[in-house]
Amino acid sequence: MDEILARAGIFQGVEPSAIAALTKQLQPVDFPRGHTVFAEGEPGDRLYIIISGKVKIGRRAPDGRENLLTIMGPSDMFGELSIFDPGPRTSSATTITEVRAVSMDRDALRSWIADRPEISEQLLRVLARRLRRTNNNLADLIFTDVPGRVAKQLLQLAQRFGTQEGGALRVTHDLTQEEIAQLVGASRETVNKALADFAHRGWIRLEGKSVLISDSERLARRAR
């Protein structure tokens, strides 16, 4: 667990001895699959770091449709905005698989920052990366067609969750077809058509809730 926590954005650049001392103050928590960790609009004063499993972060549109912002896995942190902004949660966090995590509340984090000012710098870097990713996603929605967005999401999931399998890359995403569509920002039918086309070209192979990427180079060219 310590190795996973050391990779979390909040701890990067912090001395290992300090990390070991700080992590002892974290509260472990386990969630079943399909559990809502927190919902959009709820008050919040706690952040979470994933030890194992996957969590989807999403928002609900005025017409009731859900849009997924990102998929998070081991060493990823979520819910940190509520630590600095006392307003309601801006998104919902729901487990895709069984999840083991650790959490801390606002008072604990402020105490950490007072003792270790470098933690605040790491948090700013995490938030800056999130903002950059959001800007990139908005640009993709405007300038990139659906197949291009599907290709890009597959590569991003591969970078985060992929494992080598022979000469291919297996991506166990644990998502339904509808969730993949929500992540891409398109209809399920359009996303399925793009996936079927990629499979027909021999770039990928679809296997339940995983994808075997056999030609990442062509997929990357399609994502541009």
UniProtKB/Swiss-Prot annotation:
Phenotype reported upon loss of the gene: Grows more slowly in aerobic liquid culture and on plates, severely impaired growth in unactivated mouse bone marrow-derived macrophages and in infected mice.
Keyword Cytoplasm: no
Residues bound to 3',5'-cyclic AMP 2: 142-143, 178-188
Record's keyword terms, sorted: Activator, cAMP, cAMP-binding, DNA-binding, Nucleotide-binding, Repressor, Transcription, Transcription regulation, Virulence
Residue range(s) of DNA binding per entry: 177-196
CDD domains linked: CAP_ED
One GO MF term: DNA binding
GO biological process, one term: positive regulation of DNA-templated transcription
Domain of life: Bacteria
GO cellular component term, pick one: peptidoglycan-based cell wall
Function: Global transcriptional regulator that complexes with cAMP and binds to specific DNA promoter sites, causing DNA-bending, to regulate transcription. cAMP improves binding to specific DNA sequences, probably by altering protein conformation. The CRP regulon is predicted to contain about 115 genes. Some genes are activated by CRP (rpfA, whiB1) while others are repressed (fadD10). There are 2 CRP-binding sites in the promoter of whiB1, at low concentrations of CRP with or without cAMP transcription of whiB1 is enhanced via site CRP1, then repressed as site CRP2 is filled.
Record's subunit section: Homodimer; in the absence of cAMP the DNA-binding domains are asymmetric in one structure; upon cAMP binding the dimer becomes symmetric, preparing it to bind DNA.
The name this protein goes by in its record: CRP-like cAMP-activated global transcriptional regulator
Organism: Mycobacterium tuberculosis (strain ATCC 25618 / H37Rv)
